[in-house]
Amino acid sequence: MDIRQVTETIAMIEEQNFDIRTITMGISLLDCIDPNINRAAEKIYQKITTKAANLVAVGDEIAAELGIPIVNKRVSVTPISLIGAATDATDYVVLAKALDKAAKEIGVDFIGGFSALVQKGYQKGDEILINSIPRALAETDKVCSSVNIGSTKSGINMTAVADMGRIIKETANLSDMGVAKLVVFANAVEDNPFMAGAFHGVGEADVIINVGVSGPGVVKRALEKVRGQSFDVVAETVKKTAFKITRIGQLVGQMASERLGVEFGIVDLSLAPTPAVGDSVARVLEEMGLETVGTHGTTAALALLNDQVKKGGVMACNQVGGLSGAFIPVSEDEGMIAAVQNGSLNLEKLEAMTAICSVGLDMIAIPEDTPAETIAAMIADEAAIGVINMKTTAVRIIPKGREGDMIEFGGLLGTAPVMKVNGASSVDFISRGGQIPAPIHSFKN
């Protein structure tokens, strides 16, 4: 490696906010199933605290050795609805508390997997878990929850969509931070290292390490050097920069898996912003020539960014996975916040952007008097985009305050301006229930 590459890497870390966003250990809990929920909770606690005992120490050790910040150490587990279904319990809050206790014991930032997969209907544990979510998130600190309500192969479970509109409202009423730890998915992936949507899929190995990187500031700085040049040059610049960022993620993942003695899973090729100035996906899009994010051309700029990040990242890694694309959470990106505040970015434009990027309507504050059916309809719209386009989409929405208020979450979750929501009713649409069938192009066999 020549000296130019060394100084380039140092600048990425010191000046451009490059970091490894997360090392996430996925742990299967299938061997913790027990008909007695308290025994199951104890088995869960024991397995997590045994398998992930050294996760934080190893993460800190690698960060110090390489001089690269590793912001979060996290754990994801088998969807808890599968574990709880073996019991006769009428709620799974005790399992959420076991996860929380284990997370605190090992020192991780979050633990994901208080989850249910209901894209084609409810099994015994699913409805119990979904109804447990508001209390589970109110009575724990580190637990994250997700529900998959649709897939390209199965269509959209509209009964579950309606239920999740209600659950989001109940969660917001019970706690300030609960809704920030709850995601509703279509086409959820089994190897996602990012919260709040991470869970450990049943097809994964017993224990694995997945890595998520962050580097929008690095991409922006690279694009500053090619101002005014053609999109061919822009695309090549993003691709080469993504390769460098992702290569470091690959190295960190390999080191962590070797030292922890577990399999290395994937690097997630996502560009994840933070509220810090200089760490914004929105500012990358503006660097391409937009006056502000939300104006015409935003979706095209995002398409270029998303695709070139994948092209550069794929060559840098043995295995890629997770969500892999650009994240556009409003509260976690100072450029997105500014665009909402100046009126150039609204919910409808955000929805268009989600047809391109990873995830969907993420960390968006809406008025607290928004009906549950309207929230459910937002989920249905996002699910439709994901199901038809064969990609992951999601909703993490915060019904708090009144339009124009600023909702403060703190830390990586940032600050969200409360956005205007279309006031026309979707009640009759959502109350139908049932299943929206899978699209014709999903029928491949």
Swiss-Prot record:
<comment type="similarity">
    <text>Belongs to the UPF0210 family.</text>
</comment>
<comment type="subunit">
    <text>Homodimer.</text>
</comment>
<dbReference type="InterPro" id="IPR007841">
    <property type="entry name" value="UPF0210"/>
</dbReference>
<dbReference type="Pfam" id="PF05167">
    <property type="entry name" value="DUF711"/>
</dbReference>
<protein>
    <recommendedName>
        <fullName>UPF0210 protein spr0218</fullName>
    </recommendedName>
</protein>
